[in-house]
């Protein structure tokens, strides 16, 4: 039977290609050279989705996430303070670079902490591996020696896809100078045992013992496949840049065999753009959107939904414009289908339910969460001036176990209105009356008639009843309905248009409506 989701497909592929195992290892990782952006998150959640699919099929899974923080600090991000100071750390391991924002930890660790803090919010809890600690504790000493002993084979594997071939005096390691801490070094000799001789641009020369030094590491194209073997990695995806023909993944597939291992099952995931900005996201400029930023507007469930509902090899945009409303509507539909409140054709139902299931940070609720449209929340949050308790009181029949998720959604609506909603979507009920427009007598009469109707019928009148009455009153007073609508909006929110008027009046209530309109009539 066809699998319900792409994550289930890859879970089956892993088990088929790697055979029965007591424990499957899935892996992800990043160099924390800047803010870990939402494009990087695509890899993490892709691995998490496959890990869940494996677990759901009855397998045990180890999910490792490597902080490649022993990589070199190559460029100072533009958003960091004390640029001059940071420039002095170029070519050192990023774990040595200070965090000039907090001055409490290293630059790398600050970026790691920020990301680690928000992963559990979306239900992701990997085992983090600090690669600087691995190298400085000599965990990879035997792997480094193995690489040096197999220099010729590694050189041939790398040269297969290189236009300019590696020189004869190339070594499969890089060295941080123990005097200046930079990698501006040249390896001069390896004695075929444990001693490496190097010289640095700073003038330092010395010999290092592979077994005890903190200063030697493998270059990334060798380090990555070495760790596949070391950690027994069964699955690791990579971006389309790594999966290009002759790219790093092709090279690594050959190199892992030299280390007497096998390449993991993989797939290529595509780039993410931010709606309205376009292009590939990069950490180096510092101008990026992080998981934290996305969670300001999207609940954890909807954040996961963005990725679970999209095939990994598909490029997509994360929207902060009006598309946010549509994305929430789509998620709510999947939720109704999952809980059987809404029906869909059988062939779609299984896929929709699986996407919803994988969108949950943890287990789905036993009953359907409280459903209220994001557009509606955006309106009522402004009417009640972002007062959570007033919003909850307005929304009827909210159960105690539904409150947490609902409050989260309300906060996302509040944040979206404040930071991203178009100006014509924003409003506030009029509280000052110093720029009042003088109404014609027939308009005053029409407003009074509408007020009388509402006073008599507010509790029983539907939105459609109010809408019909507005049209009726406008015509009876020789006012174009479009003009009458504009006048009412202008009175209520000092704008010529706003939320659907009849529903808007129902939400603000007769008392507030009368208080504002009475100033004009």
Curated annotation (Swiss-Prot):
Signal peptide: none annotated. Keywords: Aminoacyl-tRNA synthetase, ATP-binding, Cytoplasm, Ligase, Nucleotide-binding, Protein biosynthesis. One of its GO terms (biological process) is lysyl-tRNA aminoacylation. SUPFAM superfamilies: An anticodon-binding domain of class I aminoacyl-tRNA synthetases, Nucleotidylyl transferase. A motif ('KMSKS' region) lies at residues 280-284. Pfam families: tRNA-synt_1f (PF01921). Belongs to the class-I aminoacyl-tRNA synthetase family. PANTHER family: LYSINE--TRNA LIGASE (PTHR37940:SF1). Able to charge E.coli tRNA(Lys) in vitro. This is Lysine--tRNA ligase.
